[in-house]
């Protein structure tokens, strides 16, 4: 084997990293282009917009019947280990468009930089930048587009900023957690905007449990964290991945008043329960809703099945 073929990280069937810096993503869903009036979702439209030189987003708008109506706005962070997939690819896109149709909400799905080409905290910073960009639309009207060319008319016309939500799955839910911690300390748009609530589906944390974890949890979860943030202070006990670590910020400081946390039927459930317990003991004063699905993580994204549709309705009901 030549030196150029020597691997330093191999997690089949998803990703392989070579010693010379090359990255092979072995399993990826296809790109989906922007579209208007999608017939599969009753008229959901989506488009892609730049936010900065390194951050962009896909914005979704459900079919509008009343142009004076204001809709909840959701900022979505996708999962897949901080290092796979995209806001523009079918795996997460298909689910988001169906969620938008069910919840009748605007969604901003953030395209952040991936590891290992861009190690954490790059994705955390990108998602915060995207959230601040969304918040910058508050108080604007359509005439603002003449002078604010970086703003989006769908958000200006239809977003109800009193119903701003975050939403993420797996590592995306981890980004939601860290964004909530940050929003409890730093203001959005100078304090003009507050996050009402957040959905954390299958949140990705590394919290020590008393139960025996599977090889998947022990190896794959920890491997993704090491790949994404190899120099993380504290390693697996870094507060960004372990919210119960000694030096972790107080969960009572979450910058929202409503939370939906969902679990599925695998070994990560024990970790999620410990996270919920820590949140409840923190004294956080918000409304907590827990969805305990007797299913597997990937079933949520198989939108042709009744299982996925029922799970989607449960999560979307939190927004509605």
UniProtKB/Swiss-Prot annotation:
Keyword annotations from UniProtKB, A to Z: Alkaloid metabolism, Cytoplasm, Isomerase, Lyase, Nucleus
Main location class: cytoplasm
Gene Ontology molecular function, alphabetical: hydrolase activity; isomerase activity; lyase activity
EC number per UniProt: 5.5.1.38
GO cellular component terms attached to this protein's record: cytosol; nucleus
Active site positions, chain numbering: 170, 266, 297
GO biological process: alkaloid biosynthetic process; indole alkaloid metabolic process
Gene knockout outcome: Reduced accumulation of vindoline and tabersonine, increased biosynthesis of catharanthine, but normal levels of ajmalicine.
Phenotype when changing residue 266 to A: Reduced activity
Outcome (variant: residue 169 to A/N): Abolished activity
Binding, (-)-tabersonine: 81, 297
Reported impact of residue 202 to F: Normal activity
Catalytic reactions on record: dehydrosecodine = (-)-tabersonine; dihydroprecondylocarpine acetate = (-)-tabersonine + acetate + H(+)
Tissue/organ expression: Expressed in leaf epidermis.
Subcellular localization: Cytoplasm, Cytosol; Nucleus
Pfam families: Abhydrolase_3 (PF07859)
Residue interval(s) of motif Involved in the stabilization of the negatively charged intermediate by the formation of the oxyanion hole: 78-80
Pathway(s): Alkaloid biosynthesis
Activity vs pH: Optimum pH is 9.5.
Transmembrane portions of the chain: none
SUPFAM superfamilies the record matches: alpha/beta-Hydrolases
Its biological purpose: Component of iboga and aspidosperma monoterpenoid indole alkaloids (MIAs, e.g. tabersonine and catharanthine) biosynthesis pathway from 19E-geissoschizine, psychoactive compounds likely to be used in the treatment of opioid dependence. Catalyzes the conversion of dehydrosecodine to tabersonine, a precursor of vindoline; this process starts with the conversion of dihydroprecondylocarpine acetate to dehydrosecodine.
Assembly with partners or alone: Interacts with dehydroprecondylocarpine acetate synthase (DPAS).
Family of this protein: Belongs to the 'GDXG' lipolytic enzyme family.
Name under which the protein is recorded: Tabersonine synthase
Organism: Catharanthus roseus
Lineage, highest ranks first: Eukaryota, Viridiplantae, Streptophyta, Embryophyta, Tracheophyta
Gene designation: TS
